[in-house]
Amino acid sequence: MLNPSAADPAPIFAALGDRTRLALLGKLADGQARSISALSLDTALTRQAITKHLHVLQDAGLVASLRVGRESRFAARRETLDEARAYLDRVSRQWDETLGRLKAFVEG
């Protein structure tokens, strides 16, 4: 699957803009692949709701699924998170440069 973040980071940030999806990604942050059943522990969400949120994360390239026997397991895709971080770093640098120019103009 082509990583959606390569051309447009918006789907990544849209997927991250939900508290439930952030919590799911947090559970996967240790690098371990987990089943939907494992991810639904300690939550009031149904397995169907967890599945829906995981598919949004998967469509954004933030998680990958793999089959283990009859079970689907999901794991975080660190490279997509790294791409999102790199995008935010670029935007931050651009703002720093712009604010630096504005400061020089105002003080100059």
Predicted stretch roles:
Residues A104-G108:
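Short, charged, intrinsically disordered terminal tails
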Residues A49:
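Residues in the helix-turn-helix
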Residues L41, K52, Q58-D59:
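Alpha-helical residues within the helix-turn-helix
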Residues L2-N3, A7-T46, V68-D82, A86:
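N-terminal helix-turn-helix DNA-binding core of bacterial DNA-binding proteins
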Residues R77-K103:
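C-terminal structural segments of small proteins and small subunits
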